[in-house]
Amino acid sequence: MQFLSISQRRKGFAEGDYARLAEQEMERARELYTEGFIRQIWHRLDMPGACLLWEAGGEEQVREMWATFPYAQAGMNEMLLVPLKPYAGFRPTKPPKTRT
């Protein structure tokens, strides 16, 4: 199952707080990507934060993995998690043509 997480920084933390944990945060993202849990990552342009496309068995698994990020462990980020389902408009509407 796929999920989209949308995170943003919490108020009350300085830029230096994020800078101190940035390398650890990126390393954890690389690990989860290599393990196949993270499919894609985007930085947000509207505010500091990120959007991640996850592949997991369920919402609880994503929340557990997200909680392993250094920013999450320090309470510096908050996250909205959206479960996704395939777009129905791409399914075939007619049976495939048979070759003769």
PLM regions with names:
Residues M1-T100:
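Conserved, structured core segments of small domains
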